[in-house]
């Protein structure tokens, strides 16, 4: 079986698995490792087809979650950013023995806008998918720029995201197209409604990809979960506001100690 790239570090007793988003790799977490490592045993994963886990083609959400869970510690906290939030959520649903708590960051159980549900317009995602075959690198850059739009450190944050992408071989177009298909089709709203493990949802007030209205809608639909909207942050709050973000994670872990 092909192994995913899985980097472990940290001095804490609590396992915390971090899953990156579309087009990126586990290097995106390096800006907060120093803040979290004294408190957790961190597991930084390159999702199938991304970063140093290149030997994979496009996968469905269920298959990706199953593959990631095969190398996972038992009873970890799972933190998933953007598309990684869908993967972490799917693992929590299908393999709860791996999970003691779930944190999603700038993520949505349904990324696509639907009737009475805010999200990315289907034609925008379809456009990105079409553009991948025309101008691969520029399409990825445009998507990264959207993630930092509106923050005080927007340009700096976008450069950091771009440097993370360029650290390693770019994912194949097939893998990126498969990821966009997950964002376009996944809908875990009903499945997560009955989720009973500790669950925190973190949003950026300025996020142009996951509207903050998602937070209030899910507060009503999922009253057993908690949400935080970070002021001044966009789609990557751990990059623009690393100290505040790390405190959120530490507080969540402390409140949900076993």
UniProtKB/Swiss-Prot annotation:
EC id? 3.1.1.85
- Specify whether DNA-binding is a keyword of the entry: no
Q: Which cysteines are cross-linked by disulfides?
A: none
- The record lists substrate as bound by 22, 82-83, 143-147, 235
Domain AB hydrolase-1 residues, every copy: 16-242
Q: What Gene Ontology cellular-component terms does the record carry?
A: cytoplasm
Top EC class for this record: hydrolase
What's in the keyword line of the UniProt record? Biotin biosynthesis, Cytoplasm, Hydrolase, Serine esterase
Tagged with keyword Transcription: no
Return one GO MF term.
Answer: pimelyl-[acyl-carrier protein] methyl ester esterase activity
Query: Superkingdom of the source?
Result: Bacteria
The subcellular localization recorded is: Cytoplasm
Classify the main location.
cytoplasm
In the UniProt entry, which residues are flagged as the active site?
A: 82, 207, 235
Copy the pathway line from the protein's UniProt record: Cofactor biosynthesis; biotin biosynthesis
Q: Could you tell me what reaction this enzyme catalyses?
A: 6-carboxyhexanoyl-[ACP] methyl ester + H2O = 6-carboxyhexanoyl-[ACP] + methanol + H(+)
Gene3D superfamilies reported in the protein's UniProt record: alpha/beta hydrolase (3.40.50.1820)
> What is one GO biological process annotated to this record?
biotin biosynthetic process
Name a Pfam family for this protein.
Abhydrolase_1
| Physiological role | The physiological role of BioH is to remove the methyl group introduced by BioC when the pimeloyl moiety is complete. It allows to synthesize pimeloyl-ACP via the fatty acid synthetic pathway through the hydrolysis of the ester bonds of pimeloyl-ACP esters.
Record-linked NCBIfam families: bioH
The family classification in the record reads: Belongs to the AB hydrolase superfamily. Carboxylesterase BioH family.
The entry describes its oligomerization and partners as:
Monomer.
Q: Report the protein name in the record.
A: Pimeloyl-[acyl-carrier protein] methyl ester esterase
- Organism name: Yersinia pestis
């Amino acid at each position: 079986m092909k192994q995913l790239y899985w980097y472990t570090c940290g001095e804490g007793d609590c396992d915390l698995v971090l899953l990156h988003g579309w087009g990126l790799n586990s290097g995106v977490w390096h800006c907060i490792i120093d803040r979290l490592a004294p408190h957790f045993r961190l597991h930084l994963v390159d999702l199938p087809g991304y970063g140093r886990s290149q030997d994979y083609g496009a996968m469905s959400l269920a298959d990706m979650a199953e593959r990631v869970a095969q190398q996972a510690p038992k009873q970890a906290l799972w933190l998933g950013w953007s598309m990684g939030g869908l993967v972490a959520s799917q693992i929590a649903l299908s393999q709860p023995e791996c999970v003691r708590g779930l944190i999603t960051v700038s993520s949505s159980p349904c990324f696509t806008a639907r009737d009475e549900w805010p999200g990315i317009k289907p034609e925008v995602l379809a456009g990105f998918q079409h553009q991948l075959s025309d101008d691969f690198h520029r399409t990825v850059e445009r998507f990264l720029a959207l993630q930092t739009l509106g923050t005080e450190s927007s340009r700096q944050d976008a450069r950091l995201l771009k440097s993370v992408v360029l650290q390693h071989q770019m994912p194949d177009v097939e893998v990126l197209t498969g990821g966009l298909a997950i964002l376009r089709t996944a809908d875990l709203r009903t499945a997560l409604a009955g989720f009973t493990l500790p669950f925190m949802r973190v949003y950026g007030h300025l996020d142009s990809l996951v509207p903050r209205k998602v937070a209030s809608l899910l507060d009503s639909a999922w009253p057993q979960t908690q949400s935080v909207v970070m002021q001044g942050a966009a789609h990557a709050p751990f990059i623009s506001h690393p100290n505040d973000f790390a405190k959120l994670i530490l507080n969540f872990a402390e409140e949900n100690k076993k």
